[in-house]
Amino acid sequence: MAPASSHREHQWTCNLVRGSRLLLLLVVSNLILCQGQAQHPPYCRNQPGKCQIPLQSLFDRATTVANYNSKLAGEMVNRFDEQYGQGINSESKVINCHTSSITTPNSKAEAINTEDKILFKLVISLLHSWDEPLHHAVTELANSKGTSPALLTKAQEIKEKAKVLVDGVEVIQKRIHPGEKNEPYPVWSEQSSLTSQDENVRRVAFYRLFHCLHRDSSKIYTYLRILKCRLTSCET
């Protein structure tokens, strides 16, 4: 029987492709793996007691999800701006994200020179920082009349995949830096604005939330891509 850590890695791989249109390129390669999860995964055969999913595969999946979420977040920003952006004054558009307290590299070049341990912590902290905002955003969009179905679908998908992604990144982190403790993540305090009876207040809250989500999703993908290239290969 494969060890618990291997089972968690295998379960995460299967979770990536369940219940979503995401990762069509990965579905075929993982279908047999997921169907056979009661037995040893294909890469565990003849390796009883010491099986691990290849690190390259873990990074491939994580970066694919992160890239997908980043693109979805960008699409959400564009769709929201097209529908509501003109009704928001320039002063309200000033963005102060709740994750601004997390000190991140100022550029990709600076990120490339940042230690692995720090990049892992940044990714995990950023992902956890969006647990509550995404939950409330999806709830409010679902309960609001006139919400674009496409906008709601994108928000739901990002929420689902962000949860899967953070699990996967933690699996990778434990493989590379076992025993490493992560930093506390910032608390989101904009729920009252997101649920306000004032339509303008709500629109500004969603505007800021979507723009911050896009910013952070891009950072997450960039950091994971750097880690992948540094620790495995950039070719896939």
UniProtKB/Swiss-Prot annotation:
CDD domains: prolactin_like. One of its GO terms (molecular function) is prolactin receptor binding. One of its GO terms (biological process) is positive regulation of lactation. Its main location: secreted. Disulfide bonds join 44-51, 97-212, 229-234. Keywords: Disulfide bond, Hormone, Secreted, Signal. Residues 1-36 form the signal peptide. Gene3D superfamilies: 1.20.1250.10. It is found in: Secreted. The keyword Disulfide bond applies. Transmembrane segments: none annotated. Belongs to the somatotropin/prolactin family. This is Chorionic somatomammotropin hormone. The gene is CSH.
